[in-house]
Amino acid sequence: MSRKIFQRQEYSIYRCSDGFVVHNTNKKFENGHTHVNNFYKAKILVIMAIKREIDDKLSKRDIESLIRLTNDNRYRNQLRDLLERLE
């Protein structure tokens, strides 16, 4: 069983047995969550999703996580463009 340890706006972070789960509570859990290994990374993803920040230093995995978390179509398209440039 996981326990919520942090929330900012619509994003919640849960502690689970294998790390942390970030969930956008405005989306269904299946489509709006991602798993990360540490709390710091989870908070960074939440802050980036809220501020709709793009960073060229993001890993492919982080970009995919932000795509899953965000509701903003414009931001999602910018992230997809960045992901295509990395591939």
List each language-model region with its residue ranges.
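Residue-level detector of alpha-helical secondary structure
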Residues: 43, 47, 51, 58-60, ...
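Short helix/strand-capping connector loops at secondary-structure junctions
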Residues: 23-30, 59-63
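Short, well-ordered helical secondary-structure segments
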Residues: 2-3, 37, 41, 54, ...
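Short N-terminal "domain-start" leader segments
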Residues: 1-21, 30, 56, 71-86
